[in-house]
UniProtKB/Swiss-Prot annotation:
Known pathway: Carbohydrate metabolism; pentose and glucuronate interconversion
GO biological process: D-glucuronate catabolic process
Top-level taxonomic group: Bacteria
Family affiliation: Belongs to the mannonate dehydratase family.
An example Gene Ontology molecular-function term: mannonate dehydratase activity
Species this protein is from: Burkholderia cenocepacia (strain ATCC BAA-245 / DSM 16553 / LMG 16656 / NCTC 13227 / J2315 / CF5610)
Keywords (A to Z) from UniProt: Iron, Lyase, Manganese
Cofactor(s) the protein needs: Fe(2+); Mn(2+)
Catalytic activity: D-mannonate = 2-dehydro-3-deoxy-D-gluconate + H2O
Protein name: Mannonate dehydratase
Enzyme Commission number: 4.2.1.8
EC category: lyase
């Protein structure tokens, strides 16, 4: 298991120097943030980012993410040009030594929360989601969240939502299949593994289709193009926000297939209505058994990349909601501690014989 940490570039208040000081963190997950969605990422920018990260004593093997243009998801006539750009970006990333590319196929909205700083009993703040609050939101007013590939003006958002009125789940599946059949052969040649991220939360939002919600969706995706390069970012928090999803079982099933290329591990506390709040990583803090999930990775021989996902804001820290230093650092150390215990004590009985 290779422990990584997301970094938003030079504008990120969490510096590479601080990340380097987290015990056990060896890799950075980042992206090129100043290129318009749909354009080719220049090779020199990728190499410059890699050099910056390596100067800090860290490694850069995982990109999160290369955004997929809405015209590809919509299946518009201009998608072939955009897919060609995407394929060229994959080639550039592979040439720079990038091994995994995380991406998503969520229409319009990336991860969606209704609160970015909900106060918990201990005084920390977290990201939270309320179904009732979503029902009261008018998406035409414009919504922006940290980490999105773009923020839309109200008129742009209204036009996009209108375009998606004719796109149901079946159409979105067809457009994902078209996309994967075009990019996976290039990823294979470039030595890059594509890793689709689940819908977050794993349910329709604002009437838009969602097709990466559960076990059956994940199984269908890996069957669309049967290649080791067509895999998953298995996000415990995203999938765990769906009460029907058994995250440990998902890790065991798709881990045994070798299709989990990137793991996001975080905890959520989910109520009976499907509302949730993001908690500390510790199992007892949320609804997920993080120790059992990590054991599932260990048992299936996972050797890929892991990162602690969204954290609370604690100890007076300010910055990107969900992406502060302190709680994510605690999460990384907790996950590494679980892994070390499994690695050492799972083999202890055999060693004593």
């Amino acid at each position: 298991m290779k422990m990584s940490f997301r970094w938003y570039g030079e504008s990120d208040p969490v510096s590479l120097q601080y990340i380097r000081q987290i015990p056990g963190v060896t890799h950075i997950v980042s992206a090129i943030y100043d290129e318009p969605v749909g354009e080719v990422w220049p090779a020199h920018k990728i190499e410059a980012l890699k050099a910056t990260i390596e100067r800090a004593g860290l490694q850069f093997d995982v990109v999160e993410s290369v955004p997929v243009h809405e015209d590809i998801k919509l299946g518009k006539p201009g998608r072939d040009r955009l897919i060609d750009h995407y394929r060229q970006t994959i080639r550039h990333l592979g040439a720079a030594g990038i091994r995994v590319v995380c991406y998503n196929f969520m229409p319009v909205f990336d991860w969606t929360r209704t609160e970015l700083s909900k106060t918990l009993d201990d005084g920390s703040t977290c990201l939270a989601f309320s179904t009732d609050a979503v029902d009261r939101i008018d998406p035409n007013d414009g919504i922006a969240l940290p980490g999105w590939d773009s923020s839309y003006r109200p008129e742009q958002l209204q036009a996009l939502l209108a375009d998606y009125r004719d796109v149901d789940e079946n159409a979105l599946w067809a457009n994902l299949e078209y996309f994967l059949k075009a990019i996976i052969p290039v990823a294979e040649e470039a030595g890059v593994k594509m890793a689709i991220h689940p819908d977050d939360p794993p349910r329709p939002i604002f009437g838009l289709p969602r097709i990466v919600k559960n076990r059956d969706d994940l199984a269908r995706i890996v069957r669309l193009v049967d290649s080791p390069a067509n895999g998953l970012t298995l996000c415990s928090g995203s999938l765990g926000a769906g009460p029907e999803n058994d995250v440990e079982a998902l890790v065991r099933e798709f881990g045994a297939m070798g299709r989990i290329h990137f793991a996001h591990i975080r905890n959520v506390k989910v109520d009976a209505n499907g509302d949730f709040e993001e908690t500390a990583h510790l199992s007892s803090c949320g609804s997920l058994d993080i120790a059992a999930i990590v054991k599932a990775y260990h048992d299936t021989g996972f050797t890929g990349y892991v990162r602690p996902d969204h954290g609370r804001m604690i100890w007076g820290e300010t910055g990107k909601p969900g992406y502060g230093l302190y709680d994510r650092a605690l999460g990384a150390v907790y996950l590494n501690g679980l892994w070390e215990a499994l690695a050492k004590f799972d083999r202890a009985p055999q060693a004593s014989q």
